[in-house]
């Protein structure tokens, strides 16, 4: 009896142990959340497009709106950032679906097709989809006029089966424009378009500019950026109203990463960091001067190559392309430039400023560039540390133009009106008020042409963006997705201007950068009327 009891107890103990073991196995085999997997891996894998808005390699390492946002998100998660750049949008969604990347961060529209398959994050800016044509050519003002043009092309081809109409309108494969035109085609069966798989939107915009293609579709921000390189591009008509732009994650029951993304964008919106980054990358793109841009593009091809070695030689902690943009704003890269106000030379220095920086001959381009950079360096050093490092340069350039005291007056006025005196987006709106007596009479330094200072800085920013795009339209980035770089979170104290060690050494192997083939009044430039976009 005792043996039987013992056997029963033994079997019960074994059964209990088996249950515990099975439970432990189930607990161990329970899949980890997406966020936990990223933490365990120690790396956030981000897919993005290689362009001058989302991600590119500058003299000081990686840059771009989506890159900087992704870097901040990785820092919040406590992991390193792995950027997986692509030249074509068609590469991104398949990579996300397969699990090769965790997030797409490149400013894509929340189209119905994309939202059905993937989960969009919070909107961080808005764009409209626009039909683009070449200035001086036929401008369709709506879909019906576009169809009439395509039909006329078919008739000229003399073949009912001709694809001539479709060839007049091309869009990129798997772009947000495909579902828009597909839906439009259901309403207008005569509408023809061709989907291109071996090009990106910038390629098609270039083809429109050169006359190889009649029409394409892009978004409003991309068009504004592209016009700085291809000034012949113009808006024909809008296909959509403003649509939200966001990042994308995989759709699944696991919302751990998505929840972190919601929290991240909520935090940076509330702190003002998002507004600061958007001002940095797209706050200057709205104004477009067709005549000025055409002249600038010609100068990029014909004049910049002569002077770029000089800008690179003396730029030091500054991006040489920024110094080039400053010099173009001052003199249009003319070393003998003179103004009735007394400023002269490549950097249009006043005589007192020239003496203060050791320039003996203002018409000597080497002395002028060296002196201009030194003067700018001194102004940057005076800008208050309460201003973000990457925005200090805009305050310094405003001071370069209108004087440091007037710039500080504009900051004080901004604060008095409830704005942020450390945000260029707020201060630039108050600079023009320094012309009005009701405002300048209450300032320390009085009247100033603050509107000119604002335009001066915004012009330099546009020239700078154009030079970036011009010298690195096709950067040498390794497209092999098996060999990708890991970029660690950056020390927030690093100077964006590059006064510290750059990231160039950190970004190696997977990304190769091809070397590119005080009151200082600016020269009064003659303003040419801008023709209407027809």
Curated annotation (Swiss-Prot):
Record's catalysed reaction(s): Exolytic cleavage of the (1->4)-beta-glycosidic linkage between N-acetylmuramic acid (MurNAc) and N-acetylglucosamine (GlcNAc) residues in peptidoglycan, from either the reducing or the non-reducing ends of the peptidoglycan chains, with concomitant formation of a 1,6-anhydrobond in the MurNAc residue
Lyase recorded as keyword: yes
Membrane topology: Peripheral membrane protein
Family matches, as InterPro entries: Lysozyme-like_dom_sf, MltF, Solute-binding_3/MltF_N, Transglyc_AS, Transglycosylase_SLT_dom_1
EC id: 4.2.2.n1
Function (record text): Murein-degrading enzyme that degrades murein glycan strands and insoluble, high-molecular weight murein sacculi, with the concomitant formation of a 1,6-anhydromuramoyl product. Lytic transglycosylases (LTs) play an integral role in the metabolism of the peptidoglycan (PG) sacculus. Their lytic action creates space within the PG sacculus to allow for its expansion as well as for the insertion of various structures such as secretion systems and flagella.
Annotated keywords: Cell outer membrane, Cell wall biogenesis/degradation, Lyase, Membrane, Signal
Gene3D superfamilies noted in UniProt: 1.10.530.10, Periplasmic binding protein-like II
Protein name: Membrane-bound lytic murein transglycosylase F
Region of interest (Non-LT domain), ranges: 25-285
The protein's enzyme class: lyase
UniProt-listed NCBIfam families: PRK10859.1 (NF008112)
Cellular localization per UniProt: Cell outer membrane
Region (LT domain): 287-534
Family to which the UniProt record says this protein belongs: In the N-terminal section; belongs to the bacterial solute-binding protein 3 family. In the C-terminal section; belongs to the transglycosylase Slt family.
Compositional bias annotation for Low complexity: 520-534
PANTHER family, per the entry: MEMBRANE-BOUND LYTIC MUREIN TRANSGLYCOSYLASE F (PTHR35936:SF32)
Start and end residues of each stretch annotated as Disordered: 507-534
A matching Pfam family: SBP_bac_3
Coarse class of the protein's main subcellular location: membrane
Molecular functions per Gene Ontology: peptidoglycan lytic transglycosylase activity
Domain notes: The N-terminal domain does not have lytic activity and probably modulates enzymatic activity. The C-terminal domain is the catalytic active domain.
Active site: 330
């Amino acid at each position: 009896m005792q043996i039987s009891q013992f056997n029963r107890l033994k079997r019960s103990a074994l059964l209990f142990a088996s249950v515990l073991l099975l439970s432990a196995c189930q607990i161990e085999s329970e899949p980890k959340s997406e966020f936990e997997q990223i933490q365990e891996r120690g790396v956030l894998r981000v897919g993005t497009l290689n362009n001058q808005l989302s991600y590119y390699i500058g003299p000081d390492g990686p840059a771009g709106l989506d890159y900087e946002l992704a870097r901040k998100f990785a820092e919040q998660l406590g992991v390193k950032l792995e950027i997986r750049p692509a030249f074509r949008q068609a590469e991104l969604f398949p990579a996300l679906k397969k699990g090769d990347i965790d997030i797409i961060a490149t400013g894509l529209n929340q189209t119905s097709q994309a939202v059905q398959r993937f989960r969009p994050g919070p909107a961080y800016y808005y764009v409209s989809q626009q039909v683009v044509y070449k200035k001086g050519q036929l401008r369709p003002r709506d879909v019906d006029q576009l169809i009439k043009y395509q039909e006329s092309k078919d008739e000229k081809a003399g073949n009912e089966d001709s694809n001539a109409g479709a060839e007049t309108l091309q869009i990129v494969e798997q772009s947000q424009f495909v579902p828009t035109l597909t839906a439009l085609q259901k309403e207008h069966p005569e509408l023809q378009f061709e989907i291109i798989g071996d090009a990106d939107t910038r390629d098609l915009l270039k083809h429109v500019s050169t006359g190889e293609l009649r029409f394409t579709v892009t978004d409003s921000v991309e068009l504004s950026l592209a016009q700085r390189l291809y000034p012949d591009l113009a808006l024909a008509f809008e296909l959509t109203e403003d649509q939200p732009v966001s990042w994308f994650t995989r759709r699944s029951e696991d919302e751990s990463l998505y929840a972190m993304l919601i929290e991240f964008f909520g935090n940076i919106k509330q702190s003002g960091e998002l507004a600061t980054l958007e001002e940095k990358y797209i706050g200057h793109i709205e104004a477009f001067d067709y005549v000025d841009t055409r002249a600038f593009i010609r100068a990029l091809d014909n004049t910049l190559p002569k002077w770029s070695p000089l800008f690179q030689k003396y730029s030091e902690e500054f991006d040489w392309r920024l110094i080039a943009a400053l010099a173009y704003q001052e003199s249009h890269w003319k070393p003998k430039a003179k103004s009735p106000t007394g400023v002269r030379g490549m950097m249009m220095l006043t005589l007192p400023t020239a003496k203060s920086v050791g320039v003996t001959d203002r018409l000597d381009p080497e002395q002028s560039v060296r002196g201009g950079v030194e003067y700018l360096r001194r102004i940057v050093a005076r800008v208050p540390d309460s201003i973000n490092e990457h925005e200090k340069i805009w305050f310094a350039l405003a001071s370069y133009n209108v004087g440091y005291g007037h710039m500080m007056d504009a900051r004080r006025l901004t604060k008095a009106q409830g704005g942020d005196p450390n945000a260029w987006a707020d201060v630039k709106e108050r600079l023009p008020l320094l012309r009005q007596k009701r405002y300048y009479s209450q300032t320390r330094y009085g009247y100033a042409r603050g509107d000119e200072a604002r335009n001066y800085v915004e012009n330099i920013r546009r020239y700078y963006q154009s030079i970036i795009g011009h010298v690195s339209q096709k950067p040498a980035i390794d497209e092999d997705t098996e060999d990708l770089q890991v970029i660690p979170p950056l020390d927030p104290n690093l100077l964006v201007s590059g006064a510290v060690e750059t990231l160039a050494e950190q970004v190696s192997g997977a990304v190769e950068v091809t070397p590119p083939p005080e009151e200082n009044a600016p020269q009064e430039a003659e303003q040419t009327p801008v023709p209407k976009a027809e």
